[in-house]
Amino acid sequence: MPFTFQIGNHSCQISERYLRDIIDNKREHVFSTCEKFIDFFRNIFTRRSLISDYREIYNLLCQKKEHPDIKGPFSPGPFSKRDEDCTRWRPLLGYIKLIDASRPETIDKYTVEVLAHQENMLLLQMFYDGVLVTETECSERCVDFLKETMFNYNNGEITLAALGNDNLPPSEAGSNGIYEAFEQRLIDFLTTPATASGYESGAIDQTDASQPAAIEAFINSPEFQKNIRMRDIEKNKIGSGSYGTVYRLHDDFVVKIPVNERGIKVDVNSPEHRNCHPDRVSKYLNMANDDKNFSRSAIMNINGKDVTVLVSKYIQGQEFDVEDEDNYRMAEALLKSRGVYMHDINILGNILVKEGVLFFVDGDQIVLSQESRQQRSVSLATRQLEEQIKAHHMIKLKRAETEGNTEDVEYYKSLITDLDALIGEEEQTPAPGRRFKLAAPEEGTLVAKVLKDELKK
């Protein structure tokens, strides 16, 4: 079924398959000789060219997609002053260019939806007449900017305005003035340093330093950019766990590669392990350590393949004794003051101490604190992580009740109570005559998988 976009004084049609190819970031479709032949006669008899329509829509949505920088109509200037990924903006800019080229009476067919994606990262989906046109990842700070300039967050309606004249007549494609107005506001936004610290910084606006930090210099160095062979760095291994293995590849920095202690690759995009995605972990490590340059997510070429890894500062300190109650409370209070909470704070080695200063070196299970959650909602990655943690606690509680281990029963009850308080759930009172009731999870859900894995042990 073809979709029709009202562009300027004419309409453009594109098939669902070709539109899907554009959305999925495939290359521009190369029309065959037969398709060109048919389109030639279509143009003679109907004055329509589907090939021309396709190219017009493609060029609006995919501006200079083959180039690493946006060359126009959007200037790459703002990206040179900040650590910005212009590829995240490209789908959005193409979508707004498409709106700008459309007839004013059809603009109400364009809508936007915002979905939870990764921690502090949202997925912006852009539609035309209910059909998904394009999508892109966006930081929460950038979404706040778009809510002010582009769309109504409550209903998804487009609120873009033309530059200086909302009633500019559309005689030619792109003459509405909408894109030009948005471009000016976007440049102002990108060239204004992010005043927020900690969790308000996102993947698009990670740092505003005019000079690259030492960690950035390391990531951009030939030492990091070269092809790394695992067998060559095995001697630099300093630890491993469920989410990855850490190697010291520099005097000042370590790299965490998503291969666990059993040598199995960890899929950081899966529901089970989304919480350990380097983008997310880096944000929380920076928050926990109150240091925006403590860590970074980066791409490393390992055995000839690009792999997303976590780069963080190397701390030559001692393991902090969290078994000491005073130490435990001190670390907990420090995290709370920085707006975060650490689910695995009790694990020895996750916190180091150097010259009296605490360093949090494992961020896979760091989440927003209870106070921070009053200001903003958590992401899908955090919700899935805490579902797994609660399922684990409930299994342990069930076993303790079955074995009559009173001490463990009280311990796991307290953990569940604390978790419920953190995520804002009310404690469920057990039914009369039953001390514990575990509702059967829906088959195929993440919790069901966790329960099955636990019961196999």
Swiss-Prot record:
Induction: Expression is regulated by the two-component regulatory system SsrA/SsrB. Highly expressed in host macrophages and when grown in an acidic environment.
Cellular compartments annotated: Secreted; Host cytoplasm
GO MF, any single term: ATP binding
CC annotations in GO: extracellular region; host cell; host cell cytoplasm
Free-text description of this protein's post-translational modifications in UniProt: Autophosphorylated.
Entry keyword annotation includes Protein biosynthesis: no
Name of the top EC class for this enzyme: transferase
Family: Belongs to the protein kinase superfamily.
Protein's recorded name: Secreted effector kinase SteC
UniProt source species: Salmonella typhimurium (strain LT2 / SGSC1412 / ATCC 700720)
Name of the gene: steC
